[in-house]
Each structure stands twice: as C-alpha cells, then as structure tokens.
C-alpha cells in the first residue's frame, strides 16, 4: 500500500511483501526526455491499467526495452533478424496508441468491433509493430503467465462469427477448449490475423517471456491454431533481445540498457530475504 508507514525514509520506495514500488512512475522508466514524456502521457489516455511504478512491472520493462529499440532506430534490424525478412519501415504501437494517428489505432478498434468487443474494454495488445511486410503482435510477460480465462464465461461476443467466421479458418480447437486456458492468446491471434488480412501483411504473434518461463508455450498454444508461412506464433525471450543489444556498437544508451537487463530484479523472496534476479544474463 502506498502509505507512509510502508515507505522507506531513505529511498522513498514503498515496501510490500513481494516487491517494492517507486514513489513516482518516472523513477522506473529509463527514457523520459520531452519526446518520451509526451508519448507516455498520450499512451496513458488510452491505456486502461498501469502499475508502472512497481519493480516487477511488465509495463515498465516493455517501455524501457521497446522505446530503446525505437529511439535508436533499431526495430527494423531486430525484426529482420527475428523474422528472416527484410523489414525496412516500422511503427511501434504500445498499448493500442498509434503515434501516427495520435490516438488508439483505428484498425485495432475496427477489429474489436468486428469481433463483438467494445472499444473501451476491447483487447489491448502490449506491443503492436506495423511494418512494410509483417504485422507483429507481441504479448509481454514478466512474472505473470499466459494462462487466462474469460471473466464472463457466457459472453462469447463474436469471436466465432466475426470476420466471416475467421475463427474456423485459423483455429484447430473449438472456442471452449482454447478459451479455457489461453483466452488472451486466442483473442490476439484472432484479431491480429484479421488485421493483417486487411493490411495484406503477414502476421507474426510472439509470446515474450523470461528465458526460464513457459518453455512449452509454442506447443501448448500451437496445438490449437492453424499456422501457415504467412501466419505464425512463436516464443520470444527478453534474453534474446538482450543478446541483440549486447552486439550493438557501444554508446551511452546501449550501456544503460545492458546494465538494466543485467541488474533487473522482480521483487524478493520474502521467506529468505533475497532479491530475485529477472534475467539469465
């Protein structure tokens, strides 16, 4: 709780049983110059939930890593290596916010409506990257996992009927089977596939996790979906992104980023009083 009795008098952080929280969100963000500040404030207008001041915040991690790649003009190079395709143009859309449109992305809102969601409470991918060849969806996880279930079991929206019954074309399993454990991944696979089709782009969907987590996610979700050369689901690790950054020419921002990865923590083990290291780097 953000109460004075839980606040460290020296460091001003708030202590909880499993993690700590900075006094301000800015303290947990590596990039916060005027351009970043403006972008972040615009994102917050469309982003629904944020615990970005917490040490174990996947949103803060997502911002720090993806903004680094974007600021340095490295997204296209990273994605080219990831996909083995020549990516030359990219727009980074974090938590639905399109910098080009200066609002939540119109096409994403169209997809939400197409599949019976409301725009205000529709699916919100962490990371979308629109490029010249591929539409990327990246669902970022830090301490959470990809096991999700519907909050309203009987409200199937139009997931099975929208997009000219696209569900039947891109899933091997029925709605109940996928939604039982992989509801969030199901929605992103469905909406992303539809959006890529409108843009006439390939679709690549990545589950971004720590190297030590969810080793079987490609198999456990992959068995439910129909993949093609133009529509793929893959596991990606934060450590793979670190390895890409580590090989870059040295500069100040690269040094900040590699140190961040090497020292990142995800709270602490309260029973033995030790800090938990996030990454295997």
Predicted regions and their residues:
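Charged, terminal alpha-helix-loop-beta segments
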Residues: 1-281
């Amino acid at each position: 709780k953000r109460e004075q009795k839980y606040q460290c008098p020296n460091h001003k952080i708030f202590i909880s049983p499993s993690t700590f929280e900075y006094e301000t969100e800015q303290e947990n963000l590596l990039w916060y110059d005027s351009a970043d500040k403006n972008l972040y404030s615009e994102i917050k207008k469309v982003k629904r939930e944020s615990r970005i001041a917490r040490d174990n915040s996947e949103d803060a991690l997502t911002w720090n890593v993806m903004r680094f790649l974007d600021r340095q003009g490295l997204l296209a190079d990273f994605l080219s290596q990831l996909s083995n395709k020549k990516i030359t143009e990219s727009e980074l859309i974090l938590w639905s916010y399109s910098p080009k449109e200066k609002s939540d992305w119109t096409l994403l809102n169209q997809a939400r409506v197409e599949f019976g969601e409301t725009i205000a409470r529709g699916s919100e991918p962490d990371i979308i990257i629109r490029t010249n060849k591929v539409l990327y969806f990246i669902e970022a996880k830090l301490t959470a996992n990809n096991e999700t279930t519907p909050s309203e079991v009987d409200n199937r929206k139009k997931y099975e009927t929208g997009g000219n019954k696209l569900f039947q074309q891109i899933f091997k399993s029925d709605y109940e089977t996928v939604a039982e454990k992989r509801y969030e991944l199901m929605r992103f696979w469905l909406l992303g596939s539809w959006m890529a089709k409108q843009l006439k782009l390939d679709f690549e969907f990545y589950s971004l996790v720590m190297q030590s987590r969810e080793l079987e996610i490609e198999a456990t979700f992959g068995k439910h979906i129909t993949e093609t050369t133009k529509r793929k689901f893959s596991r990606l690790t934060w450590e793979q992104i670190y390895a890409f950054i580590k090989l870059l020419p040295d500069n100040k921002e690269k040094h900040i980023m590699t140190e961040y990865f090497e020292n990142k923590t995800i709270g602490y083990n309260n029973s033995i009083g030790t800090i938990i290291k996030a990454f295997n780097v």
